[in-house]
Amino acid sequence: MRIIARRTLREFADSLAGQKNQPAVKAALDAWFAEVSRAEWENTADVKRLYATASIVSAARIVFNIKGNDYRLVVSADFEKGIVWIKWIGTHEAYDRIDVAEIEHGE
C-alpha cells in the first residue's frame, strides 16, 4: 500500500521528544509503516488478517492501535488504488474526544 503521508508519523514521534516512551512510539510507528507499505490489501478483511485489533469504522476508515493501545492511528483506505491516507494520530485519551468517522488530516 502507498501511505500518504509518512511525514505525519515522523512529526508525531518528534513531538514526543524528551518523553521516555518516545523511542518505543517511533519504533511502533516505523514498524506499522513498514508492514503496511508491504501489504497489498484488497478489502477490510485483509486488514483484519494482519491487524486483528484494528477497528473497521467504515469501508474506508480504519483505526489502528499503536504501542499497546496507548496511541490510535486513524486512516482512510482506497483499496482499489492501493492508497492509505493518514487522517489522525494521538493518544487514546485524545481519540476519545474526536469523531473518528469525520476527522481529517490536520484537525
What are these regions (language model features)?
Residues 1-70, 78-83, 92-107:
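Basic, Lys/Arg-enriched alpha-helical interface segments
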